[in-house]
Amino acid sequence: MMKCVVLVILGLTLLLGTQAMPSSRLSCYRKLLKDRNCHNLPEGRADLKLIDENVQHHFWEGKGCEMICYCNFSELLCCPKDVFFGPKISFVIPCNSH
């Protein structure tokens, strides 16, 4: 009986410990804008590209098309595209990585 209890506790400890370890998955983060203005983005920011003229205040961040930033008043909210739009919608968002 004692052996069974020890095994259950050890199993739960291992299970909870592996879930608590950081994953390599990208997460969301915020960046404050110096001039608190979304209208002049992406001027002066080589790492931001407008997604589409019809989609205001949404930018691709970096060279690829994995992170999307939304300009909201005085900050940029950046998330992986699957988190931002969801996996069913994110694959139809136009990506021009050039």
UniProtKB/Swiss-Prot annotation:
Whose protein is this, by species? Answer: Rattus norvegicus
Q: Which residues are glycosylated?
A: 72
User: Where are its TM segments located?
Assistant: none
Q: What is this protein called?
A: Scrapie-responsive protein 1
Main location per the UniProt record = secreted
**What GO CC annotations are associated with the protein?**
cytoplasm; extracellular region; Golgi apparatus; neuron projection terminus
Q: Where is the signal peptide?
A: 1-20
Give one GO biological process term: mesenchymal stem cell proliferation
Query: Where would you find this protein in the cell?
Result: Secreted
Q: Belongs to which family?
A: Belongs to the SCRG1 family.
Q: Which InterPro entries match?
A: SCRG1 (IPR028063)
Q: Which UniProt keywords apply?
A: Glycoprotein, Secreted, Signal
